[in-house]
């Protein structure tokens, strides 16, 4: 069973700039933005998350690589993409993560797509799934019972990031194509809970 989350109005707040180092034009968000182009920005190159957790996307329409953005300062692309294999130097769309709940997050991982094969129940951060006993470097599918998670391609939270939430797809991610428009493989080797 997937637990539904409650979205509280005004819980998310983020300020973005079109130049690195918090310089240039500035805009504040309290809700999703499918394209900064509509605001007259070409891109976002620095940002500060003041409250809530967000997902930043490389392209408009919530497409391309995705990056979890938790409370803090991101003076340049290396602050949000420094651990990824192919960092995006800009972000052009954003949305809040409604179900982030670090204390009450539960995730089931499956060996094969469509929730088949061996499974593992997670409720903590795992910098290496292999170290916790998971065989191989791939996860076929996920079921998010509660909370929100960021899954990474390589151990130590490196490589491509995939954001999984209990309030998207009813918490069911049957195939890597549902992890994001940039997902091209079942390779996932580390997972962690997203913090508000």
Swiss-Prot record:
Keyword Acetylation: yes
Domain Beta/gamma crystallin 'Greek key': 12-51, 52-98, 105-146, 147-195
Keywords, ordered alphabetically: Acetylation, Eye lens protein, Repeat
An annotated GO BP: visual perception
InterPro entries cross-referenced by the UniProt entry: Beta/Gamma-Crystallin, Beta/gamma_crystallin, G_crystallin-like
GO molecular function term, any single one: structural constituent of eye lens
N-acetylthreonine modified-residue sites: 2
Region annotation (N-terminal arm) ranges: 2-11
Subunit: Homo/heterodimer, or complexes of higher-order. The structure of beta-crystallin oligomers seems to be stabilized through interactions between the N-terminal arms.
Domains (record comment): Has a two-domain beta-structure, folded into four very similar Greek key motifs.
Known function: Crystallins are the dominant structural components of the vertebrate eye lens.
Family recorded in the similarity comment: Belongs to the beta/gamma-crystallin family.
Protein name (database record): Beta-crystallin A4
The species this protein was found in: Mus musculus (Mouse)
Organism placement in taxonomy: Eukaryota, Metazoa, Chordata, Craniata, Vertebrata
Gene name per UniProt: Cryba4
